[in-house]
Swiss-Prot record:
Molecular-function annotations in GO: hydrolase activity
Species of provenance: Cereibacter sphaeroides (strain ATCC 17023 / DSM 158 / JCM 6121 / CCUG 31486 / LMG 2827 / NBRC 12203 / NCIMB 8253 / ATH 2.4.1.) (Rhodobacter sphaeroides)
Family according to the record: Belongs to the UPF0173 family.
SUPFAM superfamilies on file: Metallo-hydrolase/oxidoreductase
Keyword Nuclease in record: no
SMART domains (UniProt xref): Lactamase_B (SM00849)
InterPro entries: Metallo-B-lactamas (IPR001279), RibonucZ/Hydroxyglut_hydro (IPR036866), UPF0173 (IPR022877), UPF0173_UPF0282_UlaG_hydrolase (IPR050114)
Keywords of this entry: Hydrolase
UniProt-listed HAMAP family: UPF0173
Name of the protein described by the UniProt record: UPF0173 metal-dependent hydrolase RHOS4_08540
Length: 230
């Protein structure tokens, strides 16, 4: 299994026979090198989105049309994109599981907000979500944009994720200290990868507080387009 950061909250996850593009905001992303777009997209099988905000949906429609990839996510957002943009999609909801190229993807709770920009103001696009992604003997908890929440308790106990990809840049999500607290209290991760940080000055620029708060856990600060082997 390989997890490759695309900057901000974007990832490329190669697991089982699937290559998932998670929240692919590439165009205009200060951390993503535009001349390496093809490298990021090569072999992708699905686009997995956590919510409607532009720094997460980003290039979703463009990639879906260009590559003929299905967009996977919360029913409201996916069906709206299907009707508006004519793309393929797999819409489901909290507690539901879909199998993508052999990987089992279960939608779980997050606490944030979800909308897209419209001419008359924000357009509601369903609720925000996280995912448990199971395959190759591992379970990844992809938090999506969220703060700490009590639901993490049963989510950790039921799904038993060993890898956490946690939005932890603060301001819009939990910060590194809160993410460390959540990981200690609710999960038993072997590996934690922070995201939604370093993109803008108002977000945290380092994961040192996360590392300090998780002794004994491998905290990997991702580098853009450098694969992490799990």
């Amino acid at each position: 299994m390989k997890i490759t950061w695309l900057g901000h909250s974007g990832f490329r996850i190669a697991i089982e026979q699937a290559v998932l593009l998670v929240d692919p905001w590439l165009t205009g992303n200060p951390l993503f090198p535009a001349d390496r777009r093809e490298e990021a997209l090569a072999g992708a099988t699905h686009i997995l989105i956590t919510h409607g905000h532009g720094d997460h949906t980003g290039d979703t429609v463009a990639i879906a049309k260009e590559r003929g990839l299905p967009v996977v996510g919360i029913y409201d957002l996916v069906t709206w994109l299907q009707e508006k943009e004519g793309i393929d999609g797999i819409g489901f909801n909290k507690g539901g599981t879909v199998t993508l190229g052999g990987a089992r993807v279960t939608m779980v709770q997050a606490t944030h907000s979800s909308s897209m920009s419209g001419e008359a103001g924000p357009i509601y696009t369903g609720t925000e979500s996280g995912y448990m992604i199971a395959g190759e003997g591992h379970v990844i908890y992809l938090s999506g944009d969220t703060d700490i929440m009590a639901d993490m308790g049963w989510m950790g106990e039921y799904h038993r994720p060993d890898v956490g990809i946690l939005s932890a840049g603060g301001h819009f999500t939990m910060d590194m200290k809160r993410a460390a607290f959540a990981a200690r209290k609710y999960f038993d991760f072997r590996t934690v990868i922070p995201c939604h940080y370093r993109t803008f000055p108002l977000l945290e620029q380092s994961a040192e507080a996360l590392k300090e708060g998780l002794p004994g856990v491998e905290v990997i600060e991702p580098q853009v387009l450098v694969p992490i082997d799990i």
